[in-house]
Amino acid sequence: MHHPFQKKMKGKASALLLCTLMIASTLAGCAGEDVERTLTQADCDAIGDDYTLDSENNACVTTETVTETVTETVTETVIEELVRGCTDSAANNYDSAAELNDGSCDYGRSHSDIMADYEAGTIDVSQALYELEVSRKCREQGSNNPCEIVEMTIGDASTIDPGDAYDSASGDIIEQVYDTLYRYAGDGSGNAIIEPRLATGYSVSSDGLTYTFTLRDDVYFSNGDKMHAGDVVYSWCRVVGYGGPASHVNWILDQSFDCNDGDGNHHDWGGDSFTHDNATNTFSVTLFAPSSAFISTIAYTVGAVINADLCEANRVIETDANGNVTSDDFCHAWLDEGPIGAGTNAYIVQSWVREDRIVLTPNWMYWESGDYNINRYTMSIVTEASTRLLAFTDGEVDFGGINIEDLVNFCYIDENGNGVLDSGEDDALDDKPNVASKDGYICSYRETFTTTLSAFNLNPKVLDAGEDNTNPDSNSTLVLNHDCSDDGVDENDCNVMETAALREAISYAFDYETHRRETYDNSLAPQYGPIPTGFLYADTQYEVFTYNLALAEQILEEAGFIRQYECDSLTHGAEPTVVPEASRDGTECRLPNVLRVMANEGNDYRIAMASQLEEALGTIGVATSGEAKPWPEYLTMYYTRTWDIRFSGWAPDYLDPDNYWSPFAGSHDIGGDAYGTGYHNDVVDQNLLTGRESQDDAEREQAYMNAFAEWVEDPNMIIIGQYNGIGVKHNDVCSPDWVAIGAAHWFDYDKLPEVNGELVGSCS
C-alpha cells in the first residue's frame, strides 16, 4: 500500500530575474539606478502573465511553485480466504459463490432414490447402472490422479473363487468383489472389531448350536440380481461340496457344519443343518458343537456370498454312460476370474492378465451408501525390489511393497524429539515404534498377527514324466524312500520326512535370531509356537528350538541317518547309491534324496532364509536344492506337493487361537493342515478339538499347553517370528482405521488431489 506525502515550497522574488526582466521593459529604474518610482499592477501586467505587484519591495514578482514528492512504500500481507464449494455448474449443488472446488459436487439423483426405482421396476438394470455411475463416480482432478490407486506387489492371485482361495494375494482381490455377513474393521485404537456387512444381526439358541441370521434387504449382485438368504446357504454349502481341491480352505467351514448334500446338487439347501426363508431374508444354521469362534470364521473370504443362480447356470458336471457324476467343478471355472454378477461388494474385475496386472472398477450397484473416492484400482506384479522402489519414489504408484532396507528413504527415527529430520536419524530404523515420516510420506509402525514360518512336507511327491511344472493340475507320485515301520524288513513304506527326528534336526539348523535381527531388520518378534503374542493363551508356549548345528547332527546320527549315500547320485525321487562302509570318508550324505527348499521370487527375505537353511543342512550332510521359483511354479509345487520345505507366512482368517493351531498342526481329519504337510498326531488333534470346542478358559488353556508339549517333540514346521514393522504410503492417500486382519478395502480409501504442487483438503 502506498502513502504519498506532499510539501509546498514558499515563493520568493529573484532579484536577478527581476532586473533582467525590467531591463527588457520600457520602464526605468532598476536596482542600483539613481531614479526610483513607485510601480503599479499595470506595470506588472505589462511585463507578462503571472506577475504581481510586491508593493513593499516596489517590484513585480513571479512566484515559482516547486513541488517535492516523497514516496514511502509500506507492504502488508493480506490473506484472502477463497470460498470453497462445488464450482461445476452441471452439478446439482453448484455454488455460484464458490471459488475453489472442494469435491462436494453432487450429480444426478441420489443412490437411494435410484435403487428405490430399480427395486420398484420403474427403471431397468442398464438405466440404473448409468444413473448410479453419474451419481457416484469420483470426479476430482489433480496431477496425482486422485480417483485412482496403483499398487505394485510381488505375488499374483491364484484364483478369485472364494471357495478355493487361501493365499493373501487372492484374498486381497476377493474382498473387493465379494462380501461376507460380517467383517473385521479397526476401532481407531489399533484393535480389531467385527462389524456387520450383509447381515443385520443374529441370535443363538440356548444350547449354543443354532445361529439365526437376518440379512439386509437392499443388496444386489453386480449384474442387478437381488441377494437372498438362499444365496448365503448355497455359497457356504458350495464350499463344503467343492472341498477346496487346490487350497483346502474348506476346512474353515467343514469344522462347523455339514450340508448333508450327498446328491451334490444343493437343491436341498443344506439338508438338516440349514433352513432359510427368502421372503424374510433370514436363515439358520446348526453347528456340530458350540463354537466361540463361529462368527469370526464366516468373516473370512471362505464365507463370501456368491450368486447362486449364476453359479448353477455355469456349473460343469460330467457324467459317465450310466449317468454317474465323474466330475463337478461347482462353477469354479466361471468364478475363477471374478465375473460380472458373481459378487455384491464395491468393485468388479475389469481385467486380469495373470502374472502381470489386475484392474478393478466400481460395482455401481454396491449397497453401501456414499460416492466412490476411487474409480480404478490397478495391481501390478513386479518382483524386482529396485523397480518397485523407483516407481514408488517417483510417485508412479501409491503402494510399492517396499523392502525393509529401503524404508530409510522415506522414514526416520526422531531421536531428539524435535520433529525435524537431523543428520544420521535415517541411518537405521531400530526404534520402529517411534518412526517418523519424511516430507511427502506417511510411515506407520504396525504390530501384526502375521507369522513367518517354514512348513515341512511329510508326504513329498515328484512330478510324473512329461508333466508341466507350471500347471497346478499336473500329476505327481509319492516319494517312498524310508522304512518307517521299522519292522526289520528292507522296504520303503514312507518318506524320510515322516520321521520326527529329521524334522526336529532341521528345526535346530535354522538361525532364528540372525533372521529376526538382520534379515528382517528387527521386524520379527520371537514366536515360539503357533499362537502369536497378543492372542489368548500365547503364554502356553516357550522357547524350545534355537540354532544348534551340533545338536541337529547328533539327532540325525542317533536316528540312524548316517553318512552313507554318494551325494552326486542323489535326486528328488530316484534310487541313491550307497557307498560301501569301508570306502566312506565322512563326506557322504545322510538322506537318500535331495530336499527341495522352496521360496518364491521377489520375496528376498524368504530367499535369504532358504539359503541359510540349505547351507547349514549341507554342513551336516543333508543335500538340498532350492532356487527361488516364479509364482506360477511356486503354486504348482505347493498344489502338487512337489516340495519338502516351504518358506511361507500366515495372516489370520479369524481372531482365535484355533485359527493358528488347527491350520498349522491339526490334521486333515479335524479340518486342519492348511499347508498340506500331511501331518497327523492324534494327541495334538484331540487337544486342538478341546481347545476349539470348550467354553471353559482353564480347559482351553490346558489343551493348548498339552498340544504344544506334544508338538515340539514332533514338529511339522519351523515357526520363525511375528511381523511387527513399518508401512509407508504417500501423504495424499487417506486410509481407514488400521486393522491387523484382512485386506485393504478400497471403497473406504480416499486420495487428496494435488493441484499446482499442493494437496487440496486433508484426511481428517
Regions found by a protein language model. Give the residues of each.
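Secretory targeting signatures
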Residues: 1-44, 66-78, 114, 506
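N-terminal lobe/hinge region of extracytoplasmic solute-binding protein
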Residues: 152-206, 340-344
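Gly/Pro-rich hinge or "lid" segments in bacterial periplasmic/extracellular proteins
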Residues: 185-189, 290-293, 298-378, 384-387, ...
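Aromatic- and charge-enriched surface segment that lines or borders ligand/interaction sites
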Residues: 200-248, 282-286, 388-393, 496-498
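Surface-exposed binding/hinge segments that line
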Residues: 214, 248-324
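Detector for C-terminal structural segments
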Residues: 353, 418, 452, 507-544, ...
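Append "and occasionally in soluble cytosolic enzymes with long acidic Gly/Pro-rich linkers
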Residues: 359-362, 466-484, 491-615, 619, ...
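Ligand-site clamp/hinge motif
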Residues: 364-419, 424-429, 444, 448, ...
